[in-house]
A protein has these predicted regions:
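Cytochrome P450 heme-binding "Cys pocket" and the immediately downstream C-terminal segment
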Residues: 75, 199-200, 336-338, 431, ...
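N-terminal membrane-proximal hinge/A-helix region immediately C-terminal to the signal-anchor transmembrane segment
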Residues: 1-169, 191-200, 221, 273-279, ...
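Cytochrome P450 I-helix active-site segment
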Residues: 187, 191, 245-252, 331-380, ...
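Cytochrome P450 heme-thiolate "Cys pocket" and heme-binding signature region
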Residues: 156, 172, 176, 311, ...
């Protein structure tokens, strides 16, 4: 505040001098020269004073945060304790999950990752933060530092609402789509579109083909499925074998929204954010809104207030599953022993593709283990989504009220105390009583009252699609040198590299 007043004073003095020189009928003599030089000297002195005050204020803040802040006793990167620039660098660079793993390996189970934020690495902490609050205890509300972003400020959807009661109402309104009846209807939709997908793959299969970029085509499949479940109609990407403009716009918008949490942490006002945002982002958003409204208007019972909810369901119900399918395809291709075990299980269980259903795949233990292991290695929501501590003990540490706290699913899933050799793809760790693995530490969809509503739908679609593809085809990785995990980045959603696979109709 002092700095701002100093600079305002400089501006007033300089402006006054300019006005006098412009509009007054001065005779240029020694008095005028003296007057002008006095103004310049005053401006320079005030500017220097303002800079000194700024430096002193900054140093005072840094010293307080490093040595006297309530969280000063916790280890972590010094830059993170002093400024939000540490978060901005890791977040906008797409490396956030990997950076968080590194800092926990360096500093331990409790790390200070911002001036007022702690990151925990333990399944106990995860339960303490995310579980239903006991009666009479205050809940861990979602933090403004992450959830006051984008259009959800005015109309918070089920993910961004911070009010537990509002969340309960929204969850209840959407739950019909994910109850037993809703899942039965979803099974038919998934199986129908998966059969079409397998058929389209056959047109691009064989030894003389360049392969299929499964990173793209799995997106087409999952968006077509969720399009039917959300809007009552498919985007026809699989049947036309090309991406829908609606889907392309949604994915591009999601990627560009990466900078919103960074802007929130840097306290950049919304009007300034709009000024620096690329013009194509706002134009694409407007066009996407128009397409969304058109689709919603065709579905009886959906009203305009559900526009944002529809977009959320589209992203959560499609992109996360598509990422899993691409990732597990790569892992199976890189681990031929696991691929062989899965092929043996699926192909011995079914005598025809028509027997592959949601219920029948639920009985395949190795298939389920492959799904769980894939979700552990690259969870759909890998980062710690901050909650506000009401003043509570988290895994033995009393945390002051108002502190942001979080647990990263990616970090827990790669902790060798819970999962030995965490970077190795080992579906066997999910079969039987493997005492070397603490399976509850893997929570790819979170848990508690704010857990993902579509978890059962995601597992259902993953099992059906993987089983069909393994049953119908032998797979061949085109780019043998591809290191898929080194190329993935997180920009709101997982940004995945191309993954070309040559499919061969299997010998029956």
């Amino acid at each position: 505040m002092c700095v701002g007043l100093a600079y305002k004073a400089v501006w007033v003095i300089a402006a006054s001098g300019s006005i006098l020189l412009t509009f007054a009928d001065f005779k240029w003599d020694s008095r005028v020269t003296h007057f002008v030089m006095t103004i310049i000297h005053a401006a320079l002195l005030l500017s220097i004073a303002g800079s000194v005050v700024l430096v002193l204020c900054t140093l005072t803040l840094v010293i307080y945060r490093l040595f006297f802040h309530p969280l000063a006793k916790y280890p972590g990167p010094k830059l993170a304790a002093c400024t939000e620039l540490w978060f901005v660098r890791s977040w906008t660079g797409g490396y956030r999950p990997f950076v968080m793993r590194q800092v926990h390996e360096k500093y331990g189970d409790v790390v200070r990752v911002a001036s007022n934020e702690l990151s925990f690495r333990s399944s106990t902490a995860h339960k303490d933060i995310c579980s239903q609050a006991p009666k009479g205890k205050a809940p861990f509300l979602k933090s403004k530092v992450f959830y006051n972003v984008g259009p959800s400020i005015k109309h918070p959807d089920i993910v961004f609402t911070r009010d537990p009661e509002d969340h309960r109402v929204q969850r209840k309104a959407l739950s019909h789509a994910f109850n037993s009846k809703g899942l039965r209807e979803a099974k038919d939709t998934i199986q129908e579109h998966t059969r079409l997908f397998v058929e389209q793959i056959s047109k691009n299969a064989g030894p003389g083909t360049k392969g299929v970029d499964v990173t793209s085509v799995y997106n087409w499949l999952t968006f077509d499925v969720i399009g039917v479940l959300t809007f009552g109609e498919s985007f026809e990407s699989v049947s036309s074998w090309q991406s829908s403009v609606w889907v392309t716009l949604l994915l591009n918008m999601a990627k560009h929204m990466t900078f919103l949490p960074a802007a929130e942490r840097l306290s950049i006002p919304s009007f300034a954010l709009g000024a620096v945002m690329p013009s194509d982002v706002s134009k694409n958003a407007a066009y996407h809104d128009k397409l969304t409204e058109e689709k919603i208007s065709k579905r009886i019972g959906l009203i305009k207030s559900n526009d944002q909810q529809a977009k959320l369901l589209m992203l959560a119900g499609s992109e996360m599953t598509a990422t899993f399918l691409a990732m597990v395809t790569y892992l199976l291709l890189k681990n031929p022993v696991s691929m062989q075990k899965l092929q043996n299980e699926v192909r011995s269980a079914f005598s025809s593709a028509g027997e592959i259903t949601g219920d029948s795949t639920n009985n395949l233990s190795y298939l389920q283990a492959v799904v769980e292991e894939g979700l552990r290695m690259l969870p759909p929501s890998p980062i710690g989504l901050p909650r506000v501590c009401p003043g509570a003990t988290i895994d033995g540490h009393f945390v002051p009220v108002g502190t942001d706290v979080s647990v990263d699913a990616y970090v827990l899933g790669h902790d060798n105390r819970y999962f030995p050799e965490p970077d190795e793809f080992r579906p066997e760790r999910w079969i039987g009583d493997d005492t070397g693995n603490e399976k509850d530490a893997s929570r790819p969809f979170s848990f508690g009252p704010r857990a993902c509503l579509g978890i059962n739908l995601a597992y259902l679609e993953a099992r059906i699609v993987v089983a069909h593809m393994v049953y119908a085809y032998d797979w061949e990785l085109v780019n043998k040198n591809l290191d898929w995990f080194k190329e993935v980045r997180l920009w709101t959603l997982w940004e995945k590299p191309e993954l070309y696979v040559r499919f061969h109709l299997r010998d029956v």
